[in-house]
A protein has these predicted regions:
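Short amphipathic alpha-helices in soluble, non-transmembrane regions
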Residues: 6, 64, 233-239, 282-296, ...
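A conserved active-site cap/scaffold subdomain adjacent to cofactor or substrate pockets
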Residues: 256-300
Length: 465
């Protein structure tokens, strides 16, 4: 790896080797996990290279290939598992300046990978009265390319399912890591080759996404004395086909009172809540539906006189629930779970009863293959890595799937098996394994046994440490 020669080849491009800047841009939100914080704290790249065009990306990748320098792509750096952290050093490819909104048409938008989701949604309504179908809770800073390469769902998934569901990404344009990099257009099922692949098998340079009707969504919070009543309310609302909701998030006490400091005045400490985004035209029906429940509306953004300083409702949900807890109590961490249907509420109750306040519940209602399901992002009052692993094992022993946010590899953070399609595509597009090394176990160690119970340690990371 000849960094000096690479810098000469990149003359005229935006290159930064200031140690503080390089370290800053070599990190994401890995510190959500105490395990990853310890493992990845020392990780840093050698250079930050910031292209403005696809042609510059091609030039950068060709030069890195020539000098054997690894490349790790970065959007806004808001991922949680070290997706954008360069385990083998090398170049961090900062795509933030490829942020143009190139085309807006009925039902679709085309952007560069660095386009920020909130900026896209500011541009699209004036043209077509539409918005993106879904977004993470990091909507304000997150880039679309980063969301496609590292995300899975978010606000809007109650209507539109997961990001990898067919039709939720229309087209991707990517560049390969070869001596002469190729530009590829992926559509249909082919987009799955690079989606949620952390940039291990191609650099995304353009994204085409579907749009849906835009509304001035109303933030609502409903309070409950019992968490399972809150969860049941969320489930019942999710199956109301006539009430348009963009977000249905039950959160157990004492999370709201203890960690949602700006909203704290609306809650009692023992009160669980459901955080919601409701379409304006659905509010009357929603109010009638809520009146049948055991809940009380404790907050309505359209009725609250003083909204100054209050974050939007979505910044209480998804990964922001954990973020707000960590800001108050740095020992907090979290899990990512899926409670199997049709008895998803039964599985939730079993885990709530088993762990109590050690693992306070946080649910997100989403759509799976046309049916309502529950993803969980429960908080964990962290004590030791061994206890964290035990909590994970108990969930799995009780039929709950864990997508482990305390691992930096695709497989361990997913279904604990090789994605043969993504692996085959990497063989085609990155034959030297220079794109985001260490993140795909199937490439680094094809014989790895996922049943071993041991976490995978990338040899390059071990050397760097």
């Amino acid at each position: 790896m000849d960094i000096a020669a690479l810098k000469r080849d990149l003359d005229g491009l935006k290159v930064d080797d200031h140690p503080a800047i390089v370290q800053q841009k070599s990190r994401d939100f890995y510190w959500y996990s105490p395990v990853l914080k310890q493992q990845l704290e020392h990780v840093t790249g050698d250079l930050i290279v910031t292209p403005k065009t696809e042609d510059e990306v091609v030039r950068i990748l060709a030069a890195c290939h020539r000098h054997g320098v690894p490349v790790t792509p970065r959007g806004s750096g808001t991922g949680n598992y070290g997706q954008a952290m360069p385990l083998s050093g090398g170049v961090v490819l900062n795509l933030a300046e490829m942020n143009a909104v190139k085309m807006i048409a009925p039902g679709r938008v085309v952007t560069g990978p660095g386009a920020v989701l909130a900026h896209i949604d500011r541009a699209t309504p004036a043209h077509t009265g539409q918005e993106l179908r879904r977004s993470p809770s990091t909507y304000t800073p997150a880039s679309l390319g980063g969301f496609v390469a590292g995300g899975s769902g978010g606000i809007g998934s109650i209507r539109w399912g997961g990001l990898r569901d067919l039709g939720n990404v229309i087209r991707l344009r990517t560049v390969t890591m070869e001596a002469e990099p190729r530009v590829m257009e992926l559509t249909g099922e082919d987009v799955l080759k690079v989606m949620h692949a952390y940039g291990t098998n191609g650099i995304i340079t353009e994204v085409e996404m579907p749009l849906t009707a835009s509304y001035d969504w109303i933030d609502v919070i409903v309070g409950f004395d019992d968490f399972m009543d809150a969860a049941g309310f969320g489930n019942d609302l999710a199956i109301q086909d006539g009430i348009l909701a963009k977000l249905i998030t039950p959160i157990a006490a004492p999370i709201p009172y203890d960690y949602f400091k700006r909203h704290q005045r609306f809650f009692r400490r023992g009160q669980s809540i459901v955080v919601l985004m409701i379409a304006p035209h659905a509010m009357d029906a929603f109010l009638a539906f809520t009146a049948r429940s055991k809940g009380e509306i404790v907050f309505r953004a359209d009725k609250e006189a003083d909204l100054k300083g209050l974050p939007p409702a979505y910044e209480l949900t998804w990964n922001h629930t954990t973020l707000r807890a960590i800001r108050v109590d740095p020992t907090i961490t979290y899990l990512q779970t899926r409670y199997p249907s049709p008895d998803h509420l039964g599985h939730v109750k079993a885990m709530v009863d088993r762990f109590g306040d050690e693992v306070p519940a946080h649910l997100e209602f989403i759509r799976f293959d046309g049916a309502i399901g529950i993803a969980g992002l429960p908080l964990v009052r962290f004590t030791t890595a061994e206890r964290l692993d035990e909590i994970i094992r108990i969930h799995e022993d009780n039929g709950c799937w864990i997508f482990n946010p305390h691992r930096y590899t695709l497989e361990e953070g997913g279904m604990k098996r090789t994605d043969e399609v993504q692996l085959a595509f990497k063989r085609e597009t990155d034959p030297q394994g220079l794109l985001n090394p260490g993140k795909m176990i199937a490439w680094e160690n094809p014989d790895y046994d996922y049943r071993s119970g041991k976490s995978f340690l990338f040899k390059g990371l071990e050397k760097a440490g």
